[in-house]
From Swiss-Prot:
[4Fe-4S] cluster 1 binds at residues 42, 78, 107. It comes from Vibrio cholerae serotype O1 (strain ATCC 39541 / Classical Ogawa 395 / O395). It is an enzyme of class 2 (transferase). Disulfide bonds: none annotated. This is Ribosomal protein uS12 methylthiotransferase RimO. GO terms for cellular component: cytosol. Its cofactor is [4Fe-4S] cluster. It is found in: Cytoplasm. Catalyzes the methylthiolation of an aspartic acid residue of ribosomal protein uS12.
Amino acid sequence: MTVQTFTPNQTTTLETAKKTIAEQSQNSQTTGNKIGFVSLGCPKNLVDSERILTQLRTEGYEIVNSYHDSDVVIVNTCGFIDSAVQESLDTIGEALKENGKVIVTGCLGAREDEIRQVHPNVLGITGPHAYQNVLEHVHQYAPKPAHNPFTSLVPDHGVKLTPKHYAYLKISEGCNHRCTFCIIPSMRGDLVSRPVGEIIGEAERLKNAGVKELLVISQDTSAYGVDTKHSLGFANGSPVRHNIKALSEELGKMGIWVRLHYVYPYPHVDEIIPLMAEGKVLPYLDIPFQHASPRVLKMMKRPGQAERTLERIKKWREICPELVIRSTFIVGFPGETEEDFQILLDWLKEAQLDRVGCFKYSPVEGAAANEIEDQIPEDVKQDRFERFMLVQQEISAAKLQKRIGSTMQVLIDEVDDEGAIGRTYADAPEIDGLVYLNGETNLKPGELVNVVIEHADEYDLWGSVLHDAQ
């Protein structure tokens, strides 16, 4: 059984909601009622979709790739920003028009009244990570088929919506923070960490299935284990603490790429950097700083010591010179002055971050930031966004120019009749840069190759494979 994903063109400047249609290979035998599935939003939502699909396949349902062939369509929604809400509502409407039998889940599902007001005819609505409730709705409108263990086989690692060579590994659910621009805690609740043994077991199954890269995700990755008071757990019979350092050490033993995402800038993040220097996890840190002005950070309810953060970044790079830092920022936050924005630009120039995404602030229903006075006009937001990205573009271009002439390991993502496309340790899938290998048509997705970097632009690299070195 194979799973393919379909995503729209991605950019490195804005992480918008992404639509994923689940498609099972056509040589799978029909084993029961047919389910269509649309997944919207972030990688954390994608993992929820994978879990639902895995359970459906385990129960004998067939997953199909068209509205017309589906007995029921499930839409896993995103509700983080207004544009994501609109995309979710539009997708629900499309599914109702094309099929008529729709079950809604995901973050927007936590706002049932809003969905019912626009689409009163949906069959059922559940909130995020309400897997059992989704299945109950499916059972009601598409009863369980007769289960045949010989035609309903599901791989040990479950159904995945990513390419075979990388997978998202979700380590916790929810968040204890109350950032004023965010409503995730109201939809997904407070932090709940997965047992460490369960996480390691899933990671091992993924590795055994051919996964070469694990992307560790959650709402707040560095808070892993806080809710358990960092209690002692067990993985493969050995004691392991429920904290991000111990978990990273265990994942690092597997001999595949381990990439940490959504790391909140707690002081104990400093403890992870030596693991990166030792090669146990990738020297890549996705850490959303959001802003640099102390005044704006205070309004956001984010850590406000920007100068201290610069000192930490300097120390991290001294410990691990190869460290790549990715971050996201919000411009046009309510009350942001030109002086605040200039502080951000100056900080960005000083920090010299490798990869950066930027959002123009968008009001989110229920967010505390909506009550802040001095909402910023859209034209000012756009101007600041463009100025911000111009500064970062220059930083990124200069950093990538320094890669020319070096040899880097590249993980191949795609191959066609023109060549191959891959990524270095410095680039996460879909949100960062790419490495183009023109003419390399004999490579395979998931293959690791050594590449001499020959050319660079603002975000991407071009190079040639060192075949003798393989």
